[in-house]
């Protein structure tokens, strides 16, 4: 009960530097890509609360799907249908674009899912995909793997799609700050769960998180990037 109250409280801080994931709250890279998908039938795999739908160009036909176990039980998802990404309930060449954000790390068969995406895409159809890289295990036990940029490109192209863009989702210094903030947040949550004396340090952890977040954000604007260290990747591809 205490941990659920803590989670709700922390969620209220999501868009402030007090939140351990504040450095991830800027979705401009992904939302910018969503606006370029054009009209047509857009399939959103792992749609959760369907936030993608509001970011798409006017005139799109949107279909959101999610996996029942994680989508419904963990996130309260509201899809058009519950389905397995490795066995999509759509006809061949029936969609113009597929959006799959922070999902394939949770799939036991990501290669099969990418082949399914290629199957339902029309020739020339687009894929917009994002994945974490340097990021803690989450949604356990449904967190199975991480991909490097080279491994991700290989899997996409193996499925019959051509990568046109693959970029880090967060700079190196912001990623370093994010990891430290997540570690502090995770330890604070564990202290609450175990009812240990560590809860007394919660105010200091919150202060440290806010300082690290702001410092990392500013440093990221001033220092050159290093693509070997990133919280994740955003990829754009087309079906050949």
At which residue positions do the language-model features occur?
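Conserved N-terminal segment of class I S-adenosyl-L-methionine
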Residues: 1-93, 97, 101, 114, ...
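A short His-aromatic
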Residues: 102, 106
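S-adenosyl-L-methionine-dependent methyltransferase catalytic module, highlighting the catalytic core
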Residues: 7-8, 12, 16-17, 82, ...
